[in-house]
From Swiss-Prot:
Superkingdom of the organism of origin: Bacteria
Keywords attached to this entry: ATP-binding, Cytoplasm, DNA damage, DNA recombination, DNA repair, DNA-binding, Hydrolase, Nucleotide-binding
Region Head domain (RuvB-H), annotated ranges: 284-366
Official protein name in the record: Holliday junction branch migration complex subunit RuvB
Record comment regarding domains: Has 3 domains, the large (RuvB-L) and small ATPase (RuvB-S) domains and the C-terminal head (RuvB-H) domain. The head domain binds DNA, while the ATPase domains jointly bind ATP, ADP or are empty depending on the state of the subunit in the translocation cycle. During a single DNA translocation step the structure of each domain remains the same, but their relative positions change.
Listed EC numbers: 3.6.4.-
Region (Disordered): 1-49
DNA repair in keyword set: yes
Keyword presence, ATP-binding: yes
Amino acid sequence: MAIISSKKQPPEPNGQPNKRPESAPSVPKEKVLQPEAAIDEQGKQEESIRPQRFADYIGQKDLKDVLDIAIKAAKSRGEVLDHLLLYGPPGLGKTTMAMILASEMGVNYKITSAPALERPRDIVGLLVNLKPGDILFIDEIHRLSRMTEEILYPAMEDYRLDITVGKGSSARIRSIPLSKFTLVGATTRVGALTSPLRDRFGLIQKLRFYEVDELSQIVLRSAQLLQTQVTDDGATEIARRSRGTPRIANRLLKRVRDYAQVKSCAEVSQNIAAEALQLFQVDPCGLDWTDRRMLSVIIEQFNGGPVGLETIAAATGEDTQTIEEVYEPYLMQIGYLSRTPRGRTATKAAYKHMGFTPPNEQLSLL
């Protein structure tokens, strides 16, 4: 059975100067700005800093308001929560939100991912073992196989499982009733979902990048749970280099904590945070070596673009999917990159950040 994680909710508590890119990063073995989830040597601490209720979840106010209404309405009618699709860049809290939904509804949850559901029996085994009201979270749901999707259609709409028994002319469909459940799907590529699957979600919500003040609160909350002293300025320094992503903020916090401990610093101040993050090649705007390499390729080798995605991937050593889903969204968000039908172009702001003179200003100097 393809269950990655299955947890029962605990009782409710009693009531979050720019430099040119160098040829190689100082710390090449760990990509501290990659928001993909990774196996942490301190997995228990990673779990402990996850918020468990809406009251602890910082940011995403619009999303929380929508889900709060949906939860209260479902509870008042004694119904299960409608199926929910969460989409947005990685590391913004989609999995955490699914756990919070289970906590707020007072039900259990099961966590899996689409690549783990390769065979029909994988999803069947999950569905038949769901209890009434359970939440089934499927990460990377856009990667579901066609056969798995077709099994989900009647399960989502009518809470039944249609199984084909026999072969050829003697084949028949047998329907097995399922407990009413809530499917929460998460994806970074909502456009890659098929229309039949997407249309079966009653709620479709986007998670946005976080503001610096929200990330500062997250850093301070996590620091307290990790028993690390961080000043307000230190938290802000970490936050503004975190690419608007909580997962990155927490990861940078741990690396800064390590640096402060080795340097025998009683607390993480702004200066200590800046020194540590400089070691990891994270600049004041949150760009790492790969970001700067991308911009450098576009500006220096292709006069600002447009440049094709495959060319950028070859120049940086990253695959195209990672560039599209991890690096480009943030570069576009801060106005350093434009994506056109002909390729990627560097903006005027990117030129200035990288220490180059924009082309139009070069002409004015002639």
